[in-house]
């Protein structure tokens, strides 16, 4: 027996348990891993589902904790990507309910902000990992490689993910930062354009409501908004959202008008770009 070669394999209890899950679920290179993404931010949800598909996974996206429970009841899943903050169920509460329902798939928490205490709380609740949004394609692939031992990264054309051309009108605008946005979506222009279109629709829908939203609802929306801003490269809007969040925490509303102005300007730029 070649002991040197044997030593190269990871035989830790965690690795063995993960392999056992893969085989018990029937996951092989001929059956793509089934992954559930739960996120109430439409831009984050769309990107993660699209990126997982490009990475050879069968991804299902839902926008609430209750929908996640329903999806888990319908099929055997290999991995869960669960937003930490959703209006109905999220974080430790959602994972506890999923475990009660019999779902044993490893769970990764996602959030626009993750400090050390929050990561510790999520780990104590049973999450195997946590990732800060926006989650790029390479980071997503690394998570799959760590938690799905039987996942095989699909071969891609070396130029398939490279940015081609530029967003000529948008690149001249201080409202949009194309390089950072393209990097967050793996250099895929079509994906970025689709996400920006979806984001523009959301902003148009929310714009009339921002001035009258209760502070707690506005705070929850701003939390989701920041992840979308990073995926779409809407720099000015991200800065305005962060300032308004700080103002809300101080019980002031002076930054709300600034956010409304940034929303209107961003919508116009996204539609023109």
Language-model regions, residue ranges each:
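As written
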Residues: 91, 123-130
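Conserved acidic segment of CheY-like receiver
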Residues: 32-43, 48-52, 80
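Acidic catalytic/metal-coordinating carboxylates
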Residues: 64, 89-94
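Short hydrophobic/Thr-rich beta-strand motif most characteristic of the beta2 strand and flanking loop
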Residues: 56-63, 71
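Short amphipathic alpha-helix used as the core "switch/output" element in two-component signaling
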Residues: 70, 92-104
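The feature encodes the CheY-like receiver
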Residues: 87, 115
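Two-component system phosphorelay core
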Residues: 128-129, 135-273
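Active-site residues of response regulator receiver
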Residues: 83, 111
């Amino acid at each position: 027996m070649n002991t040197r070669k044997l030593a190269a394999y990871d035989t830790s209890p965690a690795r063995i348990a993960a392999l056992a899950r893969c085989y018990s679920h029937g996951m092989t290179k001929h059956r793509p891993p089934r992954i559930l993404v739960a996120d109430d931010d439409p831009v984050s949800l769309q990107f993660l589902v699209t990126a997982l598909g490009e990475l050879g996974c069968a991804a299902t996206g839902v926008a609430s904790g209750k929908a996640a429970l329903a999806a888990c009841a319908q099929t055997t899943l290999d991995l869960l990507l669960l937003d930490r903050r959703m209006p109905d169920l999220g974080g430790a509460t959602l994972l506890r309910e999923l475990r009660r329902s019999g779902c044993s798939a490893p769970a990764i928490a996602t959030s626009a902000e993750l400090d050390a205490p929050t990561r510790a709380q999520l780990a104590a609740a049973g999450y195997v990992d946590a990732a800060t949004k926006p989650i790029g394609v390479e980071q997503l692939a690394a998570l799959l490689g760590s938690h799905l031992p039987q996942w095989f990264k699909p071969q891609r054309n070396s130029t398939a993910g490279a940015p081609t051309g530029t967003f000529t009108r948008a690149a001249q605008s201080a409202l949009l930062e194309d390089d950072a946005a393209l990097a967050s979506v793996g250099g895929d222009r079509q994906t970025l354009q689709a996400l920006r279109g979806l984001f523009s629709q959301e902003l148009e829908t929310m714009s009339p409501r921002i001035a009258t939203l209760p502070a707690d609802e506005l705070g929850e929306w701003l939390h989701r908004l920041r992840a979308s801003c990073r995926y779409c490269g809407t720099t000015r809007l991200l800065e305005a959202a962060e300032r308004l969040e700080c103002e809300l925490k101080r019980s002031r509303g002076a930054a709300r008008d600034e956010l409304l102005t940034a929303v209107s300007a961003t919508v116009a730029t996204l539609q023109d770009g």
